[in-house]
Amino acid sequence: MSDVITTDQPASATSLLQAKGIANLVERALLTEVRLTPKPGLVDIRNSGAHKDMDLALFEKSTLAVAPWMENFYQLGYDTSALEAELVLPMLRPIGMACEADMLQATGGVNTHRGAVFSFGLISAVTGRMVALEEELEQNRICYWVARMCRDLVAKELSSEATNAATSKSVEHFLHYGLSGARGEAESGFQTVRTVALPIFERIRAQNEDMNLALLQTLLHLMAWNNDTNLVSRGALKGLYYVQQQAQKMLWEGGVLMRGGLEALQAFDDELIARNLSPGGSADLLAVTWFLSHFPKGETFAD
């Protein structure tokens, strides 16, 4: 791992234990997501999805490179708990950049987890903050603090006033299509996860002990309703709408829970590979869903 970013305040034994626990849970979330099979257009055990430059082994290697950095995000969140939440976000960037550098070194320059580093870096920092403030780690409270930390993030980073001629894909998606991507999801406190993914996942888990089926059905719901900018990058709005419509159609018929559901999902996978479409944003949100499912729901906060 690259040089660890330290803070002046010594970490307590409890804080270090919590930090390691959060990092381990993030690692499990990322490995659970990538090994889930079959996933339409995504890397899994069956194939490399619509990707020519990555496979399961590379994702696993990348996970082992990025997960330890979650302890650093956590510790910074813990150490800055007295500050206004939105002031902490810029402080996380150097850790994120160092984490990405380790990821790229591990993968030979392939971007496997940039979106996941963004989401889980925020979540890890927020959990550190909550432990410092002696708050219970709950799904909605974690999402509330992520929203607070990312207040006005879209306007600050994606609006026309915040950009110049040298625009990124994220800025292009926002200015041309009004799609805010991972930044918008974070600013909303993972609204898609809270209102779509977690309720579906937890309901199926309560009715069915099969974790894989619950996750695959949840992924279909995310693909149906998430405005995944990864799909826009590969297939423009036409690609996004195609995936959403096909996922909605499959869910209308029962999804993976219907007879022949897994075979239908494999056919969906083959079709997305042929179209070079990969819903990577939804995959990241599925990992976030699995992570948050390990905490009690808590009180709902107003969006």
Curated annotation (Swiss-Prot):
Keywords: ATP-binding, Nucleotide-binding, Transferase. One of its GO terms (biological process) is prosthetic group biosynthetic process. Belongs to the CitG/MdcB family. Its EC number is 2.4.2.52. Catalyzes the formation of 2-(5''-triphosphoribosyl)-3'-dephosphocoenzyme-A, the precursor of the prosthetic group of the holo-acyl carrier protein (gamma chain) of citrate lyase, from ATP and dephospho-CoA. It is an enzyme of class 2 (transferase). This is 2-(5''-triphosphoribosyl)-3'-dephosphocoenzyme-A synthase. It catalyses: 3'-dephospho-CoA + ATP = 2'-(5''-triphospho-alpha-D-ribosyl)-3'-dephospho-CoA + adenine. GO terms for molecular function: ATP binding; triphosphoribosyl-dephospho-CoA synthase activity. The gene is citG.
